[in-house]
Regions:
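A glycine/threonine-rich phosphate-anchoring loop and its flanking beta-alpha core
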Residues: 101-197
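Short glycine/serine/threonine-rich phosphate/pyrophosphate-binding segments
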Residues: 39-40, 88-94, 130-133
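Buried hydrophobic packing segments
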Residues: 70, 92-97, 186-187
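DPxDG-like acidic metal-binding loop motif
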Residues: 84, 90-103
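Short hydrophobic segments within beta-strands
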Residues: 32-33, 84, 123
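Short, glycine/charged-enriched secondary-structure capping and boundary segments
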Residues: 44-47, 96-99, 134-138
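ATP/NTP phosphate-donor binding region
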Residues: 1-80
C-alpha cells in the first residue's frame, strides 16, 4: 500500500478576524486574491501588506501570460505568499512562492527544477479545488497552445487555512459547481487503481 499523507499543516478558524490575528500579517507578506473576496472580508482590517487582485491580470484559467503580468507587480522578495481564492489563485501563488518563478517556460518544460523561496499559505474559498493540499500547478501555456501541470514538492503549500466565512458568501452557482468538483474528487479517489481503504 502506498503512503497516504497530506503535507501542508491544516488549521481551521472561526472567522477572518481570527485568521488574520493568528497569522500576524506584516508588510513583508503578499496577498493574492480576488477583489470580490478581499473587499467584504478583509478591507476594513487595513492589512499592512500589498494585495494583488488576480482579475486585474486576466480572467479564466491561469495562463503563462497572466502569470507574467502578475509577476511584474510581485517582483520584490516577500516573507510569505498568502493565497485566498479558488484554483486559479492557488495555482498562481504556488509559482509566486518559487525562487525561479521568472523561468515559467523552463519549469513547465522540465528544464528547470522548482525551488521554494518563501512559505505559502493557501486559503481556499470554494468547496472543491483540492489545489490547497497538492504539489501541482496547472497553467495554460498560451504560446504553445496547450495546458500543462507542474508537479514538484516545492509547490506544496506550507499551511492551509480553512475559514468558513469565505465559503458562506459564495454565490449559489459557484457553490453548486465547486461542490460537484469536490464530489468528483471523492469518486476519483475511490475508483483510482491506487485506491486504499483510507482514500
Amino acid at each position: 500500500m502506498q503512503e497516504f499523507r497530506i503535507r501542508p499543516a491544516i488549521r481551521q478558524y472561526d472567522d477572518c478576524a481570527q485568521f488574520v490575528s493568528d497569522l500576524g500579517i506584516t508588510g513583508d507578506d503578499l496577498i493574492l486574491t480576488n477583489e470580490y473576496i478581499f473587499r467584504p472580508h478583509f478591507e476594513s482590517m487595513r492589512l499592512p501588506c500589498p494585495v494583488l487582485y488576480q482579475e486585474r491580470y486576466g480572467s479564466g484559467e491561469p495562463s503563462d501570460d497572466m502569470f507574467r503580468a502578475l509577476l511584474a507587480d510581485a517582483a520584490c522578495p516577500h516573507g510569505r505568499i498568502i493565497a485566498i481564492g479558488g484554483g486559479t489563485i492557488l495555482d498562481l501563488a504556488k509559482l509566486l512562492a518559487l525562487k525561479n518563478r521568472d523561468q515559467v517556460a523552463a519549469l513547465y518544460a522540465g528544464e528547470a527544477v522548482p525551488e521554494k523561496a518563501c512559505p505559502l499559505i493557501a486559503v481556499p474559498t470554494t468547496c472543491g479545488t483540492g489545489s490547497e493540499v497538492t504539489n501541482v500547478s496547472v497553467l495554460s501555456l498560451v504560446s504553445l497552445g496547450t495546458k500543462k501541470g507542474l508537479a514538484h514538492d516545492a509547490l506544496y503549500p506550507d499551511m492551509v487555512a480553512l475559514v468558513p466565512d469565505l465559503v458562506k458568501g459564495l454565490p449559489y452557482r459557484f457553490f453548486a459547481t465547486s461542490s460537484l468538483d469536490a464530489l468528483i474528487h471523492v469518486v476519483e479517489s475511490a475508483l483510482s487503481p491506487k485506491a486504499t481503504p483510507f482514500s
